[in-house]
């Protein structure tokens, strides 16, 4: 007669109590509020057995549960023999380590290690279990923005790029930012799509978020980034990509023309460059340039060059886009300065002649005119009604435009004043009463050559000492000690004429009238002018009083004046008579 199943089971348990305890442990339902161990992908998972080691412990075991609830034993340790055995489970081969206190370690944590592990401590009478749940985390790679657009265009929705985040567990979330602010989806302006792909061999996720964006002009320097938000052992974290900046294309809204010149003002002879630019991006590369008086534009790049400009280049210049939709204009003034000097170059005139000189200018602004003679600035413009030797020299008429840098003109006049030699002789007895000094005052240009001749006897102490030739004048002198009356002749000769003048000189023993060696020509001219004025007044009064008396008086006056001049030129009448008598005696 067979035993009932229940009775048979009880009998079996009495014979094999340990087996019954293990079977009972396997049939226990999962407990709530399980202990969790957080592990990092690739690191070692450490799971302590959270049971108190009982008396009479025979061994300890670790197992994990399959998704369907069935157990898989992986490690065994005997409390008596102190030996450890690892079950033949391929996923955990060479990865397990069970310590004396029944702490289980798993090397090189994987995503597949996310399971419910159970620590079992077995005695003869009981089996104790404590489950541990393992959670594995993998930090993702830094986000990268790939497949970036070459440029963005306003008013156009365009793929900006893809933010790729690799090897994350659990899967993370990707967010786009512009200048540090979250980009929220806006229809036809901001379009974001996220895809997640799991690697079946590793269990890791790769997230790809694409961004389509319609920019504005203000986005020209905007920084775009993407951030992945993921979970780690210590909580939620984020990683940001490197920022990227995109070139934003937008149409030209304004055209500007500028004048490129080395100075603020333009003068004749300068090179001028006109530059046209548009505020679009990219800027226009070609424009139409309009010069004054022309209706058709000249097609060119963004610059138009004019070389060696003239005054007729003054006017309004324009530039426009090729389609002529936008235009700008600017005015150019080419400054000029003309100078006309009459006469100019080398001019030769005779002394006493008149020479009209004019320096006229024509300019775009008021100009300053000044004269320079022989490197010295003149106070007034030269005027020659009666040329004198001192008027000769190098004249420069110079004019400048103060407001225009580098604009000045100058012309030169080299004035040569020629004259035939003019001679005036003077004599003076020296203080030692032993000699006389005879001076020949000479005027003329070119400079006359002077020669002396002596008629009579007498010793020539010092001959031909010449003063400096200044303003067409110089003097030559000799010192003589005549033993008798002599005649000295001064000969002055230049390219125009030869002039000869003689002077009678008494013997040193005969006193005579001495003339001053030199007189100031200006003073003599003033004296002559005053004399003429006085004579004129006197003559007028006498004419009113008595015409006949005045005529007689004038006749007498002129006779006396003539005799005085004769005396002055020849020495005096007495001296001449004495000289004639002495000469006559000598001849006898």
UniProtKB/Swiss-Prot annotation:
Source organism phylogeny: Eukaryota, Metazoa, Chordata, Craniata, Vertebrata
Post-translational note: Glycosylated.
Q: Which residues form the signal peptide?
A: 1-33
Q: What is this protein called?
A: CD166 antigen
Recorded source organism is Gallus gallus (Chicken)
The record ties this protein, via InterPro entries, to: CD80_C2-set, Ig-like_dom, Ig-like_dom_sf, Ig-like_fold, Ig_sub, Ig_V-set, Surface_Rcpt/Adhesion_Mol
Name the residues that span the membrane: 533-553
Where are the coiled-coil regions? none
Q: Where can this protein be found? A: Cell membrane; Cell projection, Axon; Cell projection, Dendrite
SS bonds (residue pairs): 49-119, 163-226, 276-319, 359-397, 440-490
